[in-house]
Amino acid sequence: MDEIQDIEGLTRRALQAISRIDTLRDLTKLKNDNLGSTSWLAKYSASIKILSQEKKPIIGKAVSEARRKILEACQDRDLALRLNAQNEQFTRETLDITALPTRIFPGARHPIHVLQDKILDFFLMRGWSVVEGPELESEWLNFDALNIGPFHPAREESDTIFAEPRSASMLLRTHTSPVQLRALVSNPLPLYCVSSGKVFRSDPLDATHTPVFHQLEGLVCDRNITLGHLKGTVEDLARYLFGAEVNLRMRCNYFPFTEPSAEFDISRDGIDWTEWGGCGLVNSKVLSMAGVDTVHYTGFAFGFGLERTLQFIHSLSDMRDIVEGDIRFSQQFGLK
């Protein structure tokens, strides 16, 4: 029959075309051309109903056989193309362990962390210990135990970030001084320790303020501790950080947790002074809160901000440069 020959011829051409297909997109198009609703096979299928009773089973069988062969060929070719694509991908992604490495541009350590490590090394070399404490602190340790009364302005929500619920009396610490209390309670005397970490204030971010900054504090509790020990420690640290030519002065001030108290300023020329931090002999009330025998033991404490210290070292005018995290800022100091 002519119809059988036509179907077999079209089937052979379709199978030959399928074997030459190189892409899945072309295979999909060819499959639609031969098996789709407007394909030649669809037309032969539609014509079966008008054939004679003798031809219907013969043509129907030929159409079914052609559809089966073409469908199987399309499936086999689809699998082969996908395997080829996968193998090509594996070849592209193969790691040549003998190849020379490409240059990797390293990140840069933030200057604050480098400065922090430098200061901690200063104290570790002198036999001090490094202590740490939580950033989420109790209101009692942050204020009451440091002789900061219930009506002190620092306890207002405009200055301090309290955690919810407010009744829990928990807050983001406003200074690292609570760490000193924890150290006094958990360590035997004499105690020489330093702590550093993030503190939090309700301040806007501008050229001179940031709501999150780094603070470093030192604490000594021993027999016969005097202001002379405090002054000598701060002076040694200043020379270590800023050079032997730096000028340091102390001004009387008031802090609830030290008595007497002072602020210390630094200057390169002895004329323009920059406030650096605060210090004093630890208030006997604070020592008593920690269970220290104030008859036989005294102590001193000091603290300062690392951001302000970094500003003075590198003559930085805008604190926002320090906190924005731009790697180019760190790299300009040669820190990697």
Swiss-Prot record:
Gene Ontology cellular component annotations, sorted alphabetically: cytoplasm
Keywords attached to this entry: Aminoacyl-tRNA synthetase, ATP-binding, Cytoplasm, Ligase, Magnesium, Metal-binding, Nucleotide-binding, Protein biosynthesis
Keyword field contains Metal-binding: yes
Binding site for Mg(2+): E259
Transmembrane region(s): none
Entry-linked PANTHER family: PHENYLALANINE--TRNA LIGASE, MITOCHONDRIAL, PHENYLALANYL-TRNA SYNTHETASE
Pfam assignment, any one: tRNA-synt_2d
Subunit (UniProt): Tetramer of two alpha and two beta subunits.
An example Gene Ontology molecular-function term: tRNA binding
Reactions that this protein is recorded to catalyse: tRNA(Phe) + L-phenylalanine + ATP = L-phenylalanyl-tRNA(Phe) + AMP + diphosphate + H(+)
Cofactor: Mg(2+)
Origin: domain of life: Bacteria
Protein's recorded name: Phenylalanine--tRNA ligase alpha subunit
CDD domains with a match to the protein in the record: PheRS_alpha_core
Localization per record: Cytoplasm
Cofactor note as given: Binds 2 magnesium ions per tetramer.
